[in-house]
Amino acid sequence: MEAILAEAAAMPWRRRAGERSLRREGRIWTLWSIGIVVTFGLPAALLAWIEPLAFPVSAIFLGHGIAVLHLQARRGAGGVKPIGNARQPAERTALGLLGDLVGHDSRELLDETGLALQRGRLGAWLVGQEGAILVRPGGHRVHCFCVRVGEGGDLPAGDRVAHLLLALREDEEGFATVANRNFSGATWRLWVEMPERARPALLEARATSRTGGR
């Protein structure tokens, strides 16, 4: 019998996350993005067709729609919060323990990007201090989740990531149930908005999601 995350059990009103719910949420976010493009793009195209001299105005209007799409992905990228450079002794100790937890294969990626890679049934996860990114099998779509460690404000960054990583390992679907989704979309959209330092982690997670395995 699989372990159930206590936080997920305490929220019975939330439908438990799984393959079906992730696909459904992905479609909803896709339709939402298409709706934004249509809402801003169609009037802009119509205005340019009616009055070609109004093309600059149409371009500005369309630019607002593109900005909304970027803001969506930026929100997802900003919610994860990679580990920074460990300077205090407690931070270095926590980061060392986290390195032991993730194992040899992911330790170097953690040091370089500040994100911990974890393979799962639902895809490849990247865990940060305040959230996680799920790269779905195939590597084309991501789901970004915001979740924090309860009363973890005083914990070193490495400990916060370790708490989330252990919760993810205990109950992957429960973790996705408890966490709040703040973005879902194409992997490249998230990559554009991520800090340059963290981008290699997303590429590695995408490669992992394509090869499968745990």
Feature-to-residue mapping (PLM):
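Canonical alpha-helical transmembrane segments of integral membrane proteins
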Residues: 25-49
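Cytosol-/stroma-facing membrane-proximal "stalk/adaptor" domains immediately downstream
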Residues: 134-214
